[in-house]
Every structure is written in C-alpha cells, then in structure tokens.
Amino acid sequence: MENLVGLLRIRVKRGINLVSRDSNTSDPFVVVTMGSQKLKTRGVENSCNPEWDDELTLGINDPNQHVTLEVYDKDTFTSHDPMGDAEIDIKPFFEVQGTDIQELTNGTEIRRVKPSGDNCLAEESRIIFSNGKILQDMILQLRNVESGEVEIQIEWINVTGSSDF
C-alpha cells in the first residue's frame, strides 16, 4: 500500500437488537469497507444479538476517510439481506496517536467523542490507554434499518517506515 500511515485493527464484538430477516431471527455478518479494502466477519446463525469477536485489520492511507460497516443477513440461495450500516469516523482516534504514552497509567482517558452528524455513535465513546495501547470502544447505531447497534473496538498499529505524527 502506497503512503501507508498505519494499520487500524477493528474488533467487531457483537450486535445488539438487530432486525430479524428470516422469520424470527437472522444469520448476521459484518462487512467493513474503506476505499478498495473490504473485509468481513464470520456469520452467526439464528441470532439477532450475535457475538462475533472477530478482528479485522485495514491499512490506513488517509485518516480523513471514513470506515463503513454494513450488517447483512446471510442467505444461501438469494442475495444477502441488508440489516443496516454505520460509518466510523477515525479522525478523532487518529489525532490522539501522537500522545506521549510513557507517562500514562492504565485506564487513563485521553479523549471523549460525542455522538454527532459525523459519526454513528449511539452514545459517548472514550479513547483510553490500556495495557500499552490506545483503544476506543464504540457502540454504533445502525442506519437505514428499524433497529440495531454494533459494538466495536478500534486499535492503532504503527507501521515501520510510516510517517511520524
């Protein structure tokens, strides 16, 4: 990847109150897209509250670019049914990556991110220092659907030779 500034590890933890697309349930999976990169979680059968706990890693060239998360109901013989989507604004997370972590204690809050028109946060999100890493836990409110949220965690991974902050 040209002009790679780092890697973004996205841990897709779980879905909350996702819509039912197959009678009383769904077989959801998540597709994460940024530019030409497209990754997906495994599917979870018969659940509107799936536990994925899958880790997906994207190469980041432009931290101003949004990451799109789409949830689908897996169908075997027909096209997958959409179950909502959300955008992840990684810019606030990227902006704190230059923080000097040597003086931080475990659990230190670095920044709070409030829900806004620039993100799909269902509630305020905290960027914290934990076990030597800067992490952000988020609950994303799905759009274009009756109900549903997805809980994720993001982590920045520096790449040798990438530009410094």
Swiss-Prot record:
Q: Which residues carry this modification: N-acetylmethionine?
A: M1
Concerning SUPFAM superfamilies, the annotation shows: C2 domain (Calcium/lipid-binding domain, CaLB)
Q: Gene3D superfamilies from the entry? A: C2 domain
Q: Where does Ca(2+) 1 bind?
A: R21, D22, D73, D75, D81
Subcellular location(s): the record lists: Cell membrane; Nucleus
Principal cellular location given in the protein's record: membrane
**Disulfide feature:** none
> Does Cell membrane show up as a keyword for this record?
yes
Q: Name one GO molecular function term.
A: GTPase activator activity
Q: Where would I find the C2 domain in this sequence?
A: 1-106
**Alphabetical UniProt keywords:** Abscisic acid signaling pathway, Acetylation, Calcium, Cell membrane, GTPase activation, Lipid-binding, Membrane, Metal-binding, Nucleus
Q: What does this protein do?
A: Stimulates the GTPase/ATPase activities of Obg-like ATPases. Mediates the transient calcium-dependent interaction of PYR/PYL/RCAR abscisic acid (ABA) receptors with the plasma membrane and thus regulates ABA sensitivity.
**Quaternary context:** Binds to PYR/PYL/RCAR abscisic acid intracellular receptors in an ABA-independent manner, both at the plasma membrane and in the nucleus.
Q: State what protein this is by name.
A: Protein C2-DOMAIN ABA-RELATED 8
Organism, by scientific name, is Arabidopsis thaliana
